């Protein structure tokens, strides 16, 4: 009744001012959208940390006890968001953004201790592991050890009739329509020594029915083991997510707009991608020169044939987003601008220079996605990664969908003209997600000491009213917490005050990335006297604490 009376007063005031009724309706609709968005994005804060960066004794962070400890730290500090990078199986270079499948999970994240609890491994077997650095992921050695342990666990699993029945039931579910092709893809890739699918036999490249049938028979045991590994991954992930949700913490996942060429997705669906007769890309994805790279970024991903996607009603994309939203609560779409315009680089070019911008599917894609997911267009649980230059049309597309964009505080001080820099806190808007930096940025301390210009440092000092900046990471955290944006995310490295050696990724540098790990002491049982307590105080002070 109160809301109805308020609406009547609003209508009368507009009428008295002779504003057209359409203006009244627009105002009311905007208010409804704000209310609907608030239910998806309440005022909140959280931490960015990929599971590989967790502590643990097996060379790579995983979904075991330390992941639960991290959730406990988030809850104790009043946080309500855990943001992760893509969770798919990684290939060469271990980049989460170059997964072997957009539907499968990264089985390197399986908790081996969890398999001890299942009775498929022993503590004594895990105790015979090699030495692993606690500070950096040793992917080659860790994956070799994990592969051995997972195969050993599988050999025991097949004698556990109750578990076998549960696994088979999971595999038969209609949502696992992708699983058999993925398991075959992995078995063939292993058989061919890890070579890309375009280098397999011609009959396998072209997916001839007889060849695939023979391969399924020849590699039946390995295919079954890959099905088992996927079941274990999703069983462990679902349990971890349920625990996080029970603590009031939502998980933000990540969808790269493009998929890796050497992936089950492209092998199974070549008609959806811009490939030549032999399955190799005609053009590849990337971006022109920008802040991150003087020669641009040449990602190597094949481009979509958007006309074919449109012809199918964007069915593959709808399946992709639906599958992601079954394992996370909110999803960030990386390189959102690609739905408006995408950068097309001839495959033979060695760098991203010489490409051109081409129209993407625009709002038609999102209308189809909305219908396919059964959600209103302005209620999609999506964060638009809208970074880059010359984004006018992409920003308009984002705003028409009422999606939150992003602001990076490290980028806020590159100009003294505050009104020209949308990343400065006083230019933030409520429907936005603010970060000190992302996985592609240096840490705040690394930026402050190694990358920021004298002008940027002076601008930050003037902005906060200090002659000297002793803790640039906490200055930016304070800004993010105080922002009018509904969500603020801080990478764990910035909360811990770590330098450039803790950087997760440097775009354009293919080797040595994605390796940083936090230490056990960084995730204390009692947050008193730690950076977590300081984060908690700021969270409460700025109205972001949950519970």
Residue ranges and their predicted role:
Residues 497-547:
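Structured C-terminal cap/extension of enzyme domains
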Residues 12-15:
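Tryptophan (W) side chains
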Residues 62-72, 314-323:
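Short, acidic/polar
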Residues 226-258:
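Conserved, well-ordered alpha-helix/loop/beta-strand core segments that scaffold catalytic motifs
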């Amino acid at each position: 009744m109160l809301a109805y009376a308020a609406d009547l007063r609003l209508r009368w005031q507009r009428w008295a001012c002779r504003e057209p009724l359409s203006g009244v309706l627009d105002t009311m609709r905007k208010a409804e959208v704000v209310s609907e968005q608030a239910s998806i994005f309440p005022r909140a804060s959280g931490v960015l940390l990929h599971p590989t960066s967790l502590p643990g004794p097996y060379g790579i962070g995983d979904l075991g006890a330390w992941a639960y400890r991290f959730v406990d730290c988030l809850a104790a500090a009043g946080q309500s968001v855990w943001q992760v990078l893509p969770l798919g199986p990684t290939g060469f270079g271990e980049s989460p953004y170059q997964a072997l499948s957009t539907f499968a999970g990264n089985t390197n994240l399986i908790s081996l201790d969890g398999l001890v609890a299942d009775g498929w491994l022993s503590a004594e077997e895990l105790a015979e592991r090699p030495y692993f650095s606690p500070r950096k992921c040793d992917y080659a050695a860790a994956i070799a050890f994990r592969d051995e342990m997972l195969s050993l666990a599988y050999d025991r699993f097949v004698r556990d009739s109750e578990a076998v029945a549960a696994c088979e039931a999971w595999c038969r579910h209609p949502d696992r329509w992708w699983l058999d092709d993925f398991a075959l893809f992995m078995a063939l890739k292993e058989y061919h020594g890890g070579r890309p699918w375009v280098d397999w036999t011609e009959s396998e490249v072209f997916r001839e029915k007889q060849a695939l049938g023979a391969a399924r028979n020849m590699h039946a045991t390995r295919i079954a083991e890959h099905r088992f590994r996927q079941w274990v991954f999703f069983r462990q992930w679902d349990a971890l997510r349920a625990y996080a949700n029970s603590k009031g913490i939502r998980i933000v996942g990540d969808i790269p707009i493009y998929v890796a060429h050497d992936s089950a997705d492209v092998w199974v669906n070549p008609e959806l991608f811009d490939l030549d007769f032999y399955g190799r890309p005609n053009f590849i994805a990337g971006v022109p020169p920008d802040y991150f790279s003087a020669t641009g970024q040449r990602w190597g991903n094949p481009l979509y044939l958007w006309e074919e996607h449109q012809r199918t009603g964007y069915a593959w994309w709808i399946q992709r987003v639906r599958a992601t939203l079954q394992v996370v609560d909110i999803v960030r779409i990386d390189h959102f601008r690609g739905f408006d315009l995408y950068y097309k680089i001839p495959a033979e070019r060695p760098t991203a220079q010489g490409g051109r911008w081409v129209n993407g599917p625009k709002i038609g894609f999102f209308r189809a996605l909305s219908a396919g997911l059964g959600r209103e267009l302005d209620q999609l649980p999506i964060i638009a990664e809208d970074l880059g230059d010359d984004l006018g049309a992409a920003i308009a597309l984002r705003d028409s969908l009422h999606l939150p964009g992003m602001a990076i505080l490290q980028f806020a001080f590159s100009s003294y003209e505050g009104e020209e820099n949308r990343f400065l806190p006083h230019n933030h808007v409520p429907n936005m997600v603010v970060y000190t930096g992302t996985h592609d940025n240096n840490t705040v301390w690394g930026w402050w000491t190694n990358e920021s210009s004298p002008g940027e440092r002076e601008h930050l000092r003037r902005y906060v009213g200090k002659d000297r900046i002793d803790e640039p990471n906490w200055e930016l955290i304070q800004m993010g917490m105080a922002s009018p944006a509904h969500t603020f995310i801080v990478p764990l490295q910035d909360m811990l005050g770590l330098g450039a050696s803790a950087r997760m990724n440097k775009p354009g540098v293919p080797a040595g990335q994605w390796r940083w790990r936090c230490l056990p002491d960084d995730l204390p049982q009692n947050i008193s006297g730690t950076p977590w307590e300081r984060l908690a105080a700021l969270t409460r002070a700025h109205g972001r604490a949950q519970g």
